[in-house]
Amino acid sequence: MTPVVATPNEDAATGNTSGYRLDLDGLRGIAIALVAVFHVWFGRVSGGVDVFLTLSGYFFVASLLKHVLATQPASASWGRAINPWPRFWRLVRRLLPALLLVLAFTAALIALVMPTTRWGPLGAELQASALYYQNWHLAFESQDYAAADSANSPMQHLWSMSMQGQFFVLTLLCALALGGLLRALSLKVEFFRRPRVVRGIVGFALLGVALVSFAWANYRHGINQPFTYYDTVARLWEPLAGGLLAVWMPKLALSARLRNLLSLVALGLIITCGWWIAGVQEYPAAWALVPVGATLILIWAGSPATARPAEGQARVSRGLAHPQLVWLGSIAYALYLWHWPLLIFYMAWRYQDEVSWLEGTGILGVSVLIAWLTTKYVEAPLRSGSLRRKKTVARTTDGDAAPDTTIKPTQTDKPGFQNSRGYRGALLAILLVISVAAGSAAVTWQRDAANATLDTENLDPRLYPGGRAFLNGAPVPKVTAQPSPDVVGMDWPITSYDSIISGWKDPSIKVGYYGDVDATRTIALVGGSHAEQWITALNDIGKRHNFRVTTYLKVGCALTTEHVFTWFGQKYYQCNDWSNRVMERLAVDKPDYVFTTSTRPPQGSEKGDNVPKDYKEIFARFRDRGQKVIGIRDNPWSTGKLKPPECLASGRKPEVCGVSRAQAMAPTDPAAALADEFPNMTFLDYTDAMCDDTYCPAVVGNILMWHDYHHLSATFVRSLIPAIEADLQKATGWW
């Protein structure tokens, strides 16, 4: 969000602090309204955060520029020039109180509302949010920020707070270092003491970094957009654009009509860009110039630098200074902090992925009320700290305040218990205690998750028949299902633990050797993670029947002749290249059989699985060179709001946590219809082991079927070994 408390005049770069920009408070009010409304109802990025970042840079850089200019005279002390602690302490005092309160609230509700399967990951996010690296945490997790649902993190929105905090600290240190260098030079050469020279050096430094950041954002946009969305380096150009305007405010006088027109167009762009720009897919690359540029225009058009003599602010600027918008801007920081977790917890409690207009209105109303209380009784008292109260606006022209925490200049001077030293001290102590408690809980959650053990290889098959319950009618005793939802997320194939699967960006072909590694007979397991999951069975069967299993695996990449897309919507060029090279490698290695998936799940609103066109092309290439293939039908994919283990951990029944058979699977194996066309292929189908006539539940035969949304748990695959063993014997005749 955007840092400003009793901000300096818009003409800060010139040293004029005679006015207070209420219109920019109102702009913050509009921006936070857009952010909250789009989050609650529309599942889109509004561009409001980009407005906040631009305003942040404008005010913060203006404040730092004033500091650098003020420390150039020889009479100024070196301590004042380069000591970062006073300003850093202001940042801490203004940013942390409200954030810590929200995180403490979030920690409590995680324990009350969220399934235990999510406590470990959410504990990591609590830590990341409190320590201001949440954006990097999410970047490496590559979470989709497009829409809110009950499976989202209640701290996902804090990426912008983390990014902005990093910007503040980096910019502060760089500004003080540059100021110290210029001061050292100015003591020897008077030229470096001139304000115009100082502004020029600062401006060109900002411009250089901003251009590099903008270029990086556009370059990375085409490579890994989900990561780039949260990348601080890719985002830096947005606040730096505001900072450049603070340094180089154009003093071009315009007519009132032209200023009104520019302001109206800019405001219209800010309000509407969320509808016609897919922010998640496009920001912070070139399309982010729309909200950022529009914000710069509103700052500039409302500045006295653009007004002709005897003309006041543009009408749009006066409209933005409406008291209600200014008030909304004054609570924008707290409102940003509160609205998202309230939305996420409500949807988790109700087990839904969207809210009605009535529900959304209630959530926003509660958010506004809590934000106002937080601003008045937590944020404002601690922001004022022990500083002397002064009656002039200039007392708070630092510009390095907490995001969107602007209050009217004299508000903290009003009498009230919340402004007493005793209240501030007690509040600070309470927040510290809560923070330590929440932090300890987060660390405990993470430690417990890391230390959780998974040992299901020796389950009694009489108690845990798994797929044999549906396939063979094996009895199912009443025992606790295994693995526990808390640990099933680690129930992966051995190849994942051995790292014998190429990642998204890894172009290499990693060949693993399993089963009887010294055998001459070979089955090659080839494809993506849905082929990989069968290694659990093939490894065991290979050891007992003397054949080797070689693996050629890549995340998200079944063998294909066409470009496929990653789950976040970008072309997966590496998959196509990898597939071609693996096909060439298989022609050289010549395994006795290739084992791979033969179908794909339905897309979007479609029902039933299918055999894609590019699968058939791969099958034809195998047929034409005489390669024998065992094609296994893909398993059903769950479609619930939560991962099946999370759904189970929340106390819901296995049927509720699964998927309709008619939705996930075609009535018969669509690949089996290709038998005449591909006589080199054998087709396996274990749908009847995973689903009854109507439903594919999350628990089958006392075993959790999925370890996430759609990958089979290794324990469940292990329960299918007898069936797979019999089918492989028929296909190969090896034993």
Regions found by a protein language model. Name each.
Residues 279, 350-354, 368, 376, ...:
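Extracellular/periplasmic envelope-modification machinery, especially enzymes
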Residues 1-13, 496-507:
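Short coil-to-helix leader/linker segments, especially the first N-terminal amphipathic alpha-helix
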Residues 2-394, 413, 423-427, 433:
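Membrane-interface helix/loop caps of multi-pass membrane proteins
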